[in-house]
Design a protein with these regions (language model features):
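Short, surface-exposed polybasic-aromatic patches that bind anionic ligands, especially phosphate groups
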Residues: 2-135
Length: 135
């Protein structure tokens, strides 16, 4: 045994009975990630979508949240820059809509970092409706 090894803290137990989570909390269950809202929860369909929110999540169980209906899916966070892998189109997510970027000058005009582009599947890009074109 190493004399300088730190003890890892014990994790709190995962709730398995009905739990009233507060609004806006991200919860991870065996069925995936969810965002808690007033009348239910929204499914976060992929890890890439979850990563765009840069939010911590708490561990839970389906038994703890089964009283909350699944109201739909949630897409990428506003301000995310995504690129559809199937057609190479780049979008800025704004007001929950994907705005097609048709000119590289848009990045300079708004101070956007091209290194923050997240390559996504066509299905992930279609979580958002089309918005106005940015050119």
């Amino acid at each position: 045994m190493w004399p300088f090894r730190r003890k890892t803290p014990d994790l709190p137990p995962i709730p398995n009975t009905r739990t009233e989570y507060p609004y806006g909390l991200f919860v991870c269950t065996e069925a995936g990630f969810f965002l808690i809202r007033e009348k239910g929860r929204y499914r976060i369909p992929t890890i890439r979508v979850m990563a765009s929110w840069s939010a911590p999540s708490v561990q839970s169980s389906e038994d703890a949240v089964k009283h909350l209906p699944i109201l739909g899916k949630i897409g990428f966070r506003d301000g995310s820059i995504i690129q559809d892998f199937s057609n190479q189109k780049t979008y800025l997510v704004s007001r929950n809509k994907k705005r097609h970027i048709t000119s590289p000058d848009v990045f300079d005009r708004f101070g956007l970092n091209k290194e923050l582009i997240t390559v996504v599947s066509h299905e992930e890009a279609n979580l958002h409706e089309d918005g106005e074109v940015l050119s």
